[in-house]
């Protein structure tokens, strides 16, 4: 029988992988090229998803709590990234000297997996509204939801 914490982590993984899937559909079907901060958020979503899957299908309460804590920390990093994209980077003519651009280029992921991590737009050009709300704010909202979903995993009581 799975615990509530394991089910929460599995749901977190589903949300995060779903967010990346939606981002890829936006990019490849609706021709919305991503900026450096967009692809960095994809990386954070994938990291959360993997960590959450390990905790959701791994064994033991300690591993589940550690994975919950890592998920919460990564979600907090995602909140910062999405907020920076919305409040600062989206108003810059170029984001080629920001942390996200240097980090993504430095990892080599943009060249190794360009269909997923390729940087094809400036942050200003990548500003898109969906249902009247900027894409970065949707991402920020999901990171906040994931953060609060991970907290009961970390601080909850034993196996329930």
Predicted regions located by residue number:
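Helix-loop junctions at the membrane-solvent interface of multi-pass transporters
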Residues: 29, 58, 87-88, 155-156
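Membrane-embedded alpha-helical transmembrane segments of multi-pass integral membrane proteins
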Residues: 15-22, 48-51, 55, 74-84, ...
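C-terminal TM-helix exit segments that contain a strictly Trp-centered aromatic cap at the helix terminus
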Residues: 22-27, 77-92, 109
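Alpha-helical transmembrane segments and their immediate interhelical/interface regions
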Residues: 28-74
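Interfacial segments of alpha-helical transmembrane regions
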Residues: 2-14, 58-79, 148
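Extracytosolic (periplasmic/ER-lumenal) interhelical loops and adjacent juxtamembrane/interface segments
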Residues: 89-134
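Transmembrane alpha-helical insertion/packing segments
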Residues: 1-45
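A hydrophobic membrane-anchoring alpha-helix module
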Residues: 118-160
């Amino acid at each position: 029988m799975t615990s509530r914490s394991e089910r929460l982590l599995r749901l977190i993984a589903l949300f995060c992988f779903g967010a990346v899937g939606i981002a890829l559909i936006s990019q490849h079907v609706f021709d919305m090229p991503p900026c450096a901060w967009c692809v960095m958020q994809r990386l954070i979503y994938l990291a959360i998803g993997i960590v959450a899957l390990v905790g959701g299908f791994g064994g033991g309460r300690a591993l589940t709590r550690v994975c919950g804590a890592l998920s919460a920390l990564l979600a907090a990093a995602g909140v910062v990234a999405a907020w920076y994209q919305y409040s600062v980077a989206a108003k810059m003519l170029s984001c080629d000297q920001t942390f996200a651009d240097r980090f993504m280029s430095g990892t080599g992921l943009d060249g190794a997996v360009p269909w997923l991590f390729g940087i094809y737009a400036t942050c200003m050009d990548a500003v898109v509204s969906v249902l009247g709300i900027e894409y970065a704010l949707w991402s920020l909202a999901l990171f906040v939801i994931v953060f609060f979903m991970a907290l009961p995993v970390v601080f909850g009581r034993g196996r329930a």
